[in-house]
A protein has these predicted regions:
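Asparagine-centered strand-capping/turn motif at beta-strand->loop junctions
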Residues: 7-11
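Short acidic/proline- and small/hydrophobic-mixed sequence motifs that coincide with surface turns
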Residues: 13-15, 57
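Extended, low-hydrophobicity, Ser/Thr/Pro/Gly-biased non-transmembrane segments
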Residues: 42-56, 60-61, 97-174
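Beta-strand-rich interaction surfaces with strong enrichment in secreted/lumenal proteins
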Residues: 5, 69-71, 83-88, 141-146, ...
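Short strand-edge motifs at loop-to-beta-strand transitions and within beta-strands
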Residues: 78-82, 94
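Short aromatic-acidic-glycine turn motif
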Residues: 24-34, 164-168
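Short Pro-Gly-centered flexible turn/kink motifs
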Residues: 2, 89-98
């Protein structure tokens, strides 16, 4: 996946860092918040899943002229912290390019991913975490269907084989 993201600082303070949510990586292993939630619901299917049944993301590169470093947070592997070289002023913006791949999980865990004949995609793109009053609200995937996002527009170009069909509940804006 090649993704271009543009962020505008609408908070009232300069931002030294930004946060991204990478919910595809919440299926990585038994240490993620999602794995713990599935286990708390007394389902052992995820705990005993084979690696090929689990999803993940692999980031090849995150680049911008204002990125110092980036890292996944230790305690939440589906949140990415991007440290900036210089703060983004109020009203300022940044454009980020991300090169990454995702591995879809077996849909039996949450209803999203793949099964024998279908792909069920939801919350699979990397997105900006929500920010309000200069406070970041980083949200890990807990399979609650409640990802709160910054207002954003998306332009997707998807290629697939002719024998497949694409269905979406996205609203098309012109």
């Amino acid at each position: 996946i090649y993704q271009i993201m543009k962020f505008k600082n609408t908070s009232n303070t300069p931002l030294k860092e930004i946060f991204l949510e990478d919910w595809s990586n919440s299926y990585l292993d038994n240490t993620t918040s999602l794995a713990k939630r599935i286990s708390d619901e007394y389902s052992r299917s995820f705990s005993f899943a084979q690696k090929k049944q689990r999803g993940s993301s692999s980031i090849n590169n995150i680049k911008s002229n204002n990125i110092e470093t980036w890292e996944r947070l230790d305690n939440t592997l589906d949140i990415i912290k991007v440290n900036l070289k210089k703060p983004i002023s109020t009203g300022g913006s940044i454009e980020i390019e991300i090169y990454y791949s995702i591995k879809l999980p077996d849909s039996k865990f949450t209803g999203y991913g793949y099964d024998d004949d279908n792909f069920y995609l939801k919350n699979w793109l990397i997105v900006f975490s929500n920010i309000s009053n200069s406070i970041w609200y980083n949200q890990s995937n807990l399979n609650l269907d409640d990802q709160s996002l910054q207002k954003a527009g998306y332009e997707l170009k998807i290629s697939f084989d002719e024998d497949l069909h694409l269905f979406s509940n996205l609203i098309k804006n012109n």
